[in-house]
Amino acid sequence: MDMNEIKEIFFQECEEQLAELESGLLKLNDGDRDPETVNAVFRAVHSIKGGAGAFGLDDLVSFAHVFETTLDCVRSNRLEPNQDVLKVMLRSADVLADLTNAARDGGGVDEARSRQLIKELEALANGELPQAAAESAPKTTPAGVAPAAPVVNEEGFQPVAFSFDDFETGDEPTIEPSTYEIVFKPKSDLYSKGNDATLLLRDLSRLGEMSIHCNMDTLPPLDRMNPEEAYFSWKISLKTDKGEEAIRSVFEFAEWDCELDVALAGGTVGMDEDLPMQPVPFDLSILEDEAQAPAGEEDRAAASEGDSRNAAVAAAQTASNVLQMAQSTARVSPENARNSQSASAAQAAAQQAASAATPTIRVDLDRVDRLINLVGELVINQAMLSQSVIENDTNGTSSINMGLEELQQLTREIQDSVMAIRAQPVKPVFQRMSRIVREIADMTGKSVRLITEGENTEVDKTVIDKLAEPLTHMIRNAVDHGLETPEKRVAAGKNPEGTVRLTAKHRSGRIVIELADDGAGINREKVRQKAIDNDLIAADANLSDEEVDNLIFHAGFSTADKISDISGRGVGMDVVKRSIQALGGRINISSKPGQGSIFTMSLPLTLAVLDGMVVTVANQTLVVPLTAIVETLQPEASAIHSFGSSQRLISIRDSFCPLVDVGRILNFRGAQANPVEGVALLVESEGGGQRALMVDAIQGQRQVVIKSLEANYTHVPGIAAATILGDGRVALILDVDAIVAASRGQSLKPEMSLAAAG
């Protein structure tokens, strides 16, 4: 594994830490004052800072350090996390995410914004904002006030009140440097755990003046040396004014992989004084060199020509660089204790918790995708085998059939297990929307509150990855277009703070995501006039409210009076609709003037496999998702009733349900089929309505592999995807909700119907 791969793992861990940071800050913003929430937020920033320091990402380290210092003030109860404080911290979390992305992608950041937030964070750490409401408090650090040092909250000590005026004289108190004796003994597997002694010593040298003695007593002969193991240990003398906590924080990510003793000069340290020590000149320029690959055969041959001790020094340099070829693993370390006794207790407790935790492993998504594809092929081959057994009319009691049934069960279990690997909660996407709301609210001068529900609803990772873009467009529209300004809301008798509600839930085997706002609703007159001006509809067109609302999905359509950085170019909602359709989903709008709008997106839980009922319609084989079917029944002539010229109803247990001829909806036939000669599938749409879909016959139930029709052909209304049956035939999977919508009068266009697909 090279350095780029290790960095990528670090950035993946940063994404997790940023999500934890965002979640914790939002909890605090909602009034949560659980100390563990504060600790989780602090650990997230501290972990990012520690990893960034190992890779020399100085900008990220500097900002995270100031952020961490301010959070430590909250941890030690020296700073009250009121709304003003949390606003600064939420914006700081956004900047921390920007710096992380810039370090990952090589892009730029808003340096002016970063500097401003550093000033605000330093001001908070210095106590310049009161703990109560502080609307009039300054947002920048006054001249003459130095940034706060990390707060030390040792047990048995109480915070002491003081005045910042004491620092205005220029005679700032200084802390006398102390000399610490440090013994650092890495365990043999230090490098394989993602740590490097040279990086740790480099970070330690930044704390003050340092001299080092290296113990090479455990160094084996060259022929038995493993360059991936650690053999050296160090005794370090450090003169610093930072204190013991700062020293221990350098080794925080290696504390489980080494023995570390820190004591003031003159105290007792853990290394045997009789052990042979060899002074090592400490040249930081050596540590700054880029790590190279392990020595080749020529290097090892050259090393073997000299004394084994001299060769060992070269081998040790190679060993220190091997980390950059080793896999780095995520670590959630316990908080550093404030003294040596609490440090030992915290470490023991953390190790016990870690041993009890559920083990996890990080796997490349490409490997998971390949596994899912193989499972899909396994499902197809299992179906083909079942078809062959049926065609050969094998005795149902034979060992072949028994083995086939076991194979079907195992295939189902494998498929369920694999799909569970890819299933992830929508929480990361929802948390990302919080930042969008904050940014748009600041740009528009609106007061907006985002409420999220169903964050733990799970869906396939492919769906989650492609969900962020359409949700971003919808959130921007909801805040910019949907919500009124505080003045207009007050005039309308509303709360000046607007509300955007984002919810996720499972329904009918799909995931349904709703985005609702309590704004003014869609101005249908304005939408209609804009559509007429753009020649989208005729001036005398008679459109329902639903049809008018759906006009906003046309490409280039916008009701904005002027173009801004947020909206007005008409490239938003059409992108949303295309993105949702590409995932096999749908989007609907419900709006009430003066009350707001609701956008409902319906998406499949997975894009890989589904359980379906194979049916025949006009000599064509189709698949209906089982999750949408309530029951099947054979219609009787007495249960069929005509309504109007073309509508038919079927009586089911003293209630009437519209009867939909699937073949006619899909333009497979012109005249309606005789319902008595077919089978009715009672289906339920996501909106809760029921329809009886009329098909010619039922072939059976199958687990089928979903193949994208849009990727290979185009989007076909009424069709969700395609699949390959056991006999090799291609069958199309019905989009039940689209069929139900078409039965309400929104007929499918002939040129885009199933017949057009060939």
Swiss-Prot record:
An example Gene Ontology molecular-function term: ATP binding
Segments forming domain HPt: 1-103
Broad class of enzyme this protein falls into: transferase
UniProt modified residues of type Phosphohistidine: H46
Keyword Cytoplasm set for record: yes
Principal location: cytoplasm
Subcellular location: Cytoplasm
Gene Ontology terms describing biological process: chemotaxis
Record's compositionally biased regions (Polar residues): 320-339
Region (Disordered): 293-346
Gene3D superfamilies reported for this sequence: Histidine kinase CheA-like, homodimeric domain, Histidine kinase-like ATPase, C-terminal domain, HPT domain, SH3 Domains
Function: Involved in the transmission of sensory signals from the chemoreceptors to the flagellar motors. CheA is autophosphorylated; it can transfer its phosphate group to either CheB or CheY.
Protein name: Chemotaxis protein CheA
